Structures are given as C-alpha cells and as structure tokens.
C-alpha cells in the first residue's frame, strides 16, 4: 500500500473496546421527571464488576454497542444515552443486584409499547457478560404516558355501560376449551348467563379451528347473550376472541362483533403482539366495544425470578397499549401469585397514582395522570369457597371468573352460575354490614346455603379442593 493511501486507526477517533462504565455508569446523575426509569435484577458473569454490568445494561439498551464507532461523533451521546445511576444489592443473594437505569424520553416513539420494549427488553437480555437479567419495574413519566390512548373505556365507563355497581363482576370461561361445536358452545354460554353471570368467555386458544369457525361462534354466542338478557333483564356479555394470525383478520372479526351489537371482544395481547393490541384498542374506543385481555404466554416471560420481566411491567404496558380487563392471577387459586405482589400490580392497573412500596414490589412512584383504569380478572382454579377471600382481596373493581367452578356444578351450568352469584352477593352484603370476610368467610357461605340449594350443592362438591403450593414470585 502506498504511503498516500495508508490509513491509521488513531486518526479521527480512538477505536477499540471500552469499559461500559466509563461512559454509562453515572452515580452522580440526577434523574429528570421526563426520564423513563427501569429497575433491573442483574446477575453478572463471575469476574464482571456490578458497575460494569449495570453500565452494560444501560448501554446495550440505549445507544451503546460493543466497540467505539466513528459515528458517535455525529451525535450527542450525552443527550441520548441510558445511564446506570444507582446499584443496590439484592438481600440474600450474593451474586445479584438491582441496577437502576434512566433513559431520556427522546429514545422512544410516542404511543408505541412495541418500540419501548424493543429497546429496554431487547438484545440486552442475551448479553454474554450477564448470566441473567430481569426487568423488575418501569417508571413511565406522564410526558410519555400521555402519548398513549390507554384502555378503550376504563372501569367507570364499563360500569355505566353495564349498569352494574357495588360488586365485582362475575365471569366464566366455557369448557371444554376446545372441541365443542358452535351451537353447543352457544348453548353453554346461554345457560351460564341466564343463571346469573355477567360475562362468559372464549378460552384464549379458541380462535377459528376446524371444529368451530369464528363466525359461527360469534353468531351463536350473540344469540345466547340476547336471549339471556331478555330473560334476566340484565346486560350480558361474552368475550368474543378476535385474536387471529394477521391484524387484518383480527380487525375483520372485531368489525363483525360490532355489527352483531355485542358489548365486548377479547385479545391475547402477548401472543398477538402489542402492535395488534393497540390497533384493536383504538378500534374498540372508536366503536363502543369493551376489550378483554388475556395474558397467555406471560409465565414464559415473568415466572423465573432471575431472568425475564416481572408481570407488573407487562401490566403497565397493557394499560398503555389498551385493555379494559386483564387476567391478574387469583392469589388463592391454581395459578402463581403472591398476595402483596399481586395487589401491587393490581393497584398499578386500577389506580391513578401509586406510591413506591418495595414491600409490594413497586420500585417507583407511578402517576397515570387520569389514564383510565383496567379491571383485574381473577381466574384459574377458583370456586365458591374462595369467594370470601376473592371479594376481600380484589374488592369491587374486579372480575371474578369461575370456569370449572361454574361448569363443574353437579346440576349443570345455570345452577353453577346461580351458586356463584348467590355466594358473591352474600359476601358483598356481609362485607357491607361490617363483617370480616377473612375470618368469617366460610360462615357467610354456609349461611347462604340455607336459602340456595344450588350453592349448597356446589359447596359439597368443592369442599376438599385446594391448591397448596409455595409461590415462587416472592420479594
């Protein structure tokens, strides 16, 4: 190579691999009100200092890459970079710590959970310098949350649409979840709704299979709920699952549901994706449809304590993306969920302002500035004996959903629904009279069986059913 064409690595900028902490670990940084804040549980590889691991997370989830590049000089890294501003040990864990990272707002597209997650929970989770990484919480500033529509309607508007106040709403997932014909499926819906439930539900894996195509199911379910409404004088709903293989097909199903005049549709927001979910949520607000959200696939993401993402983050993301209901565990049923942690993210779904409370897993104060709330849905392995605890734990603004706990009644679906309705109203009345459901719940249920043979039969069937396993989602 001639001297005239020879280049040197030292010309222009200093190339090579740098320690992340030199640029991205900034313990002196004062966070701004507009920053998005993240709390990561970090498990570094042996020999990697905590400061370097925390800085690597900040770098790889914002502006950094593995080497210095000359185009760094064409922008202001100081303006756009993520910053690891604090590190604290995890009690009882020698090799883990919490890294707090602040991201400037300009890194994220307005109104896009998809873009937010692509950065914050993207490639950094496969970074070799880390043995494991878990996103425990996010602080979404009002400057960013106001760029989202949020839930299509919210809790108060839903109650006004249904004309139902002062108690939790009751639901039921139709079983068997797969295999029924559309007409038999509609028959099961009708029996549950006329028996006293407010809602019935498609199971999350019911889309449009050979045994029951979606259009047939929609028609028979609409017929069932209109018939039940006429008989009971109450507004009824069935969560028609619009989830599909393409956004176009999903929207076609939502449009048909609206044409049928039903009050609510459903989406599997994690398997369907945030882009599809936000699209559907916007349509639901514009067209007066409530939107029920199922969280199928969440445990793949959130169940491991050391890696992935806590459900409280997925709950915040759903509130921004849009949904009027979301499944949130039961505390007392067959699915994972510790009480204080569960109530922490239930408050994040429902309330306007939630204070930092590490005892409930809430790492940051969250201000939703009047974004509509989401009703938490308790579903999975629950029955009439759980009703006092569910009423006491979740309060009025919730949906209590009994699938097997309705359809497993020895006398059929309608008596199963009646048993749940009687149990709920007995618990609400007892609570309103000042009785302690935590201590007197079983007595309240037994008293109600005296004037409800349906409830008495249900109590006899499920008196021995318990799911007593230790939770792994603890603080």
From Swiss-Prot:
Its main location: plastid. This is Ribulose bisphosphate carboxylase large chain. It comes from Abies magnifica. The lineage of its organism: Eukaryota, Viridiplantae, Streptophyta, Embryophyta, Tracheophyta. The keyword Lipid metabolism does not apply. It catalyses: 2 (2R)-3-phosphoglycerate + 2 H(+) = D-ribulose 1,5-bisphosphate + CO2 + H2O; D-ribulose 1,5-bisphosphate + O2 = 2-phosphoglycolate + (2R)-3-phosphoglycerate + 2 H(+). The modification N6,N6,N6-trimethyllysine is found at residue 14. Substrate binds at residues 123, 173, 177, 295, 327, 379. Belongs to the RuBisCO large chain family. Type I subfamily. The basic functional RuBisCO is composed of a large chain homodimer in a 'head-to-tail' conformation. In form I RuBisCO this homodimer is arranged in a barrel-like tetramer with the small subunits forming a tetrameric 'cap' on each end of the 'barrel'. It is found in: Plastid, Chloroplast. The gene is rbcL. Gene3D superfamilies: Ribulose bisphosphate carboxylase, large subunit, C-terminal domain (3.20.20.110), RuBisCO large subunit, N-terminal domain (3.30.70.150). It comes from the Eukaryota. Its cofactor is Mg(2+).
């Amino acid at each position: 190579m001639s001297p005239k064409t020879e280049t040197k690595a030292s010309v222009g900028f200093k190339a090579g691999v740098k320690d992340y902490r030199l640029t991205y670990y900034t313990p002196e940084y004062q966070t701004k009100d507009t920053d998005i804040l993240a709390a990561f549980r970090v498990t570094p590889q042996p020999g990697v200092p905590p400061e370097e691991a925390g800085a690597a997370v900040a770098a790889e989830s914002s502006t950094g890459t593995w080497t210095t590049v000359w185009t760094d000089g064409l922008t202001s890294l100081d303006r756009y970079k993520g910053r690891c501003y604090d590190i604290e040990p995890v009690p009882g864990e020698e090799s883990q710590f919490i890294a707090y990272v602040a991201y400037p707002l300009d890194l994220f597209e307005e109104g896009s959970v998809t873009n937010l997650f692509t950065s914050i929970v993207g490639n950094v989770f496969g970074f070799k310098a880390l043995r494991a990484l878990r996103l425990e919480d996010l602080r979404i500033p009002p400057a960013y949350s106001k760029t989202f529509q949020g839930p299509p309607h919210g809790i108060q508007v839903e109650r006004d649409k249904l004309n139902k106040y002062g108690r939790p709403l009751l639901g039921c997932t139709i079983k068997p979840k797969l295999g029924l014909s559309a007409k038999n499926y509609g028959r099961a819906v009708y029996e549950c709704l006329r028996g006293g439930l407010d809602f019935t539900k498609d199971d999350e894996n019911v889309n449009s299979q050979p045994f029951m195509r979606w259009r047939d199911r929609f028609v028979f379910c609409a017929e069932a709920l209109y018939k039940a409404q006429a008989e009971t004088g109450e507004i009824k709903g069935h969560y028609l699952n619009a989830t599909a293989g393409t956004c176009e097909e999903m929207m076609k199903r939502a449009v048909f549901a609206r044409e049928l005049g039903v009050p609510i549709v459903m989406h599997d927001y994690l398997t369907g994706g945030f882009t599809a979910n936000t699209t559907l949520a916007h349509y639901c607000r514009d067209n007066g449809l409530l939107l029920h959200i199922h969280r199928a696939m969440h445990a793949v993401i959130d169940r491991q304590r050391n890696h992935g993402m806590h459900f409280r983050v997925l709950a915040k993301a759903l509130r921004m993306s849009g949904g009027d209901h979301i499944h949130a565990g039961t505390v007392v049923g067959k699915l994972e969920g510790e009480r204080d942690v569960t109530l922490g993210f239930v408050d994040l779904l429902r309330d306007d302002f939630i204070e930092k409370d590490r005892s409930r897993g809430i790492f940051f104060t969250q201000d939703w500035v009047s974004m509509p709330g989401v009703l938490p849905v308790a579903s999975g392995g629950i029955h009439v004996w759980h009703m006092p605890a569910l009423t006491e734990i979740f309060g009025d603004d919730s949906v209590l959903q009994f699938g097997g706990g309705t359809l497993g009644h020895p006398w059929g679906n309608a008596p199963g629904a009646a048993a749940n309705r009687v149990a709920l109203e007995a618990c609400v009345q007892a609570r309103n009279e000042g009785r302690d459901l935590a201590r007197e719940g079983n007595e309240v249920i037994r008293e109600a069986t005296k004037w409800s043979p349906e409830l008495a039969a249900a109590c006899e069937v499920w008196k021995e059913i318990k799911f007593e396993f230790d939770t792994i989602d603890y603080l």
